């Protein structure tokens, strides 16, 4: 992505209504996965605030603050996606010289933030695959898991993933309806 001067560039003037000490940051979130993602921002109170849902390979321009952390979850399972191999993205202000003739004058630019799939072990990949398949194809996935002839540790991990996916579906569903 070529450098893009931020549209809301106010030449360093404070954003109207912004708290003192907050620095505005301009980002372009790009979903590089084949999954639909929920974007959340988190401020001082550590509460996840649903921002929007991003389809596969979709982008969105966001004006945020350095004090807002961002996280990204799979729309259906709640699995966390990553930015630069990290689960949480902390915005950083990017400024460049306005021109070569006046290198002292800096302007804000919008930085591209690539959201990607997390690195997982083969075991984790298989567990997620089985859990997602069971939720899509079965009315009683827990009963099926208990019937599998696999080690109890794998059963517990599958049950834990099912619980995680189901609880995320409930919580995210109420956030999306607001």
Curated annotation (Swiss-Prot):
It comes from the Eukaryota. Part of a complex with Cul2, Roc1a/Rbx1 and the elongin BC complex. Interacts with sima/Hif1a. Interacts with itself. Interacts with mgr and betaTub56D/tubulin beta-1 chain. Interacts with tubulin alpha-beta heterodimers by itself or in complex with mgr. Interacts with microtubules (MTs). Pathway: Protein modification; protein ubiquitination. Involved in development of tracheal vasculature. Probably involved in halting cell migration at the end of vascular tube outgrowth. Possesses E3 ubiquitin ligase activity when in complex with Elongin BC complex, Cul2 and Rox1a/Rbx1, and can target sima/Hif1a for ubiquitination. May play a critical role in promoting microtubule stabilization when tubulins are correctly folded by the prefoldin complex. If tubulin is incorrectly folded, may promote its degradation. Keywords: Angiogenesis, Developmental protein, Differentiation, Ubl conjugation pathway. Pfam families: VHL. GO terms for cellular component: nucleus; VCB complex. GO terms for biological process: cell differentiation; centrosome cycle; epithelial cell migration, open tracheal system; establishment or maintenance of polarity of follicular epithelium; lumen formation, open tracheal system; mitotic spindle assembly; negative regulation of microtubule depolymerization; open tracheal system development. InterPro entries: VHL_beta_dom, VHL_beta_dom_sf, VHL_sf, VHL_tumour_suppress_b/a_dom. The gene is Vhl. This is Protein Vhl. Belongs to the VHL family.
